[in-house]
Each structure stands twice: as C-alpha cells, then as structure tokens.
Regions:
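C-terminal accessory segments enriched in acidic
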Residues: 38, 72-75, 84-215
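Active-site/substrate-binding loop(s) of hydrolase catalytic cores
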Residues: 1-88, 92-101, 120
Length: 215
C-alpha cells in the first residue's frame, strides 16, 4: 500500500524504514528473516532523494548521494564501514567524470531503527544510495542511469576483490548534503502585506504525488 500511495508510510502510518528494530510490520519481519537466512556479505540500501539538496555549499543539485551508515552513536569508522566507504569512493570517481560536484554524502546521524544502520550494526558493509535530482529530470530518468552505473561499479569491486579497506579516507572529502534548493523561485514579487506594498521572493517546493500512475 505504501508504493500505491507513493510514500514509504503504510496505510497504518508506519514508516518501514523506522521499523528495523520493532519489526512490527510483516514486511519488516520478512526482510529481517531473509537477512538472517541469507547472511549477505554486502547490503545496498536504495532511496529516492528530494530536489532540495545540494552536494555541499554549491549551486548544483545533489544528483546522487551516498552514505556508509553509522552503526553506533559515536559513528565509529569500523572495518565494515571502511569497506562501504571504499565502494563509495570508487563510485564517486566515476560520477565525477560525468556530473562533477553533484555527488554528496547524506547525514550519518545514527538511528538504529533505520534498516541501513541496523544492517551495518551487524558488521555487514552497507551502502546507502540516494537517487537525487538532475536539472529538469523530475522523473529521475537521468538519475536512474547514474544509479545503475554506480551499482555496476560496486558489484564489480566486490566481484574482483578490490576492497581491502585502503583509500577509504577519500570518502570524507565528498561534500555533505545541504538543503539549498526550491523548485521555483519567483523573484521581486509585489505583495501587499499589512496594507503595505512589499517586494519579496516567493519560493515554491513541489510535492511529489502520483496522478494516473504517473509522477
């Protein structure tokens, strides 16, 4: 029902990405059961990201963002996080050739209720992907290509055993996401407020909804 309504909240208002510990929903139980049965060596955590984010203090959108989720309150750089960071560094190198300065790092504040943080806490290298915004690409068709490329690079790194934890330090050179954008800004609009005419900028933020199964 969450997908049908274009939200990760279910009809009962439960956010599945905050249910990794409580396991109150059948979907959460199914994922946890499969994780414990399959015992993955790596986990990929895929998200969509709103249009408001930049990659650092720059006038460009964050087209793709990554995160090696924290696994404790101290955000300790554990061995499995180093491996996740190394994967991100390799993906970022490819993307910088195509969308320079449009790759960011998402906030790594620890929340054990999130699926990615939970999987990382089990000492499994976990990489979070955020499909962000490319100018004019509200259906994320361009972004989809960059996510696909990144997945291929990540899988190649794993399959070719290129992950010894070396080079993870470059992860910290990737700028963090900042909230810097609106979808539309109307400049120098004349408004009458409190019987006084004022010139203001008006910012508009889109709300993504499905209409006839289209975004």
């Amino acid at each position: 029902d969450g997908a049908k309504a274009y939200t990760r909240f279910k009809a009962n208002e439960i956010d599945l990405n905050r249910d990794a510990q409580d396991l109150s929903q059948p979907e959460s139980v199914a994922l946890s059961t499969f994780f414990n049965k399959f015992k993955p060596d790596f986990c990929f955590n895929l998200h969509g990201q709103r249009t408001i984010f930049s990659a650092g203090n720059i006038n460009k959108p964050a087209t793709v963002s990554f995160l090696a989720p924290a696994q404790d309150e101290a955000c300790t750089v554990t061995d499995n996080r180093k491996i996740a960071m190394t994967i991100i560094v390799k993906m970022n190198k490819n993307l910088q050739l195509q969308i320079p300065k449009q790759v960011g790092i998402y906030d790594d504040a620890f929340n054990i209720n999130c699926v990615g943080d939970t999987f990382q806490s089990y000492n499994v290298p976990t990489v979070l992907f955020e499909a962000g915004h490319f100018e004019g690409d509200y259906n994320r068709e361009v972004v989809r290509e960059y996510i696909f490329q990144s997945l291929l690079i990540a899988i190649h790194c794993i399959a070719s055993n290129q992950l010894d934890g070396e080079g993870y330090e470059d992860y910290f050179k990737i700028p963090e996401n900042e909230k810097r954008f609106y979808d539309i800004i109307i400049r120098n609009a004349k408004l009458k407020l409190d019987n006084k005419e004022q010139i203001l900028d008006i910012a508009i933020q889109y709300q993504e909804t499905l209409v006839d199964n289209a975004l």
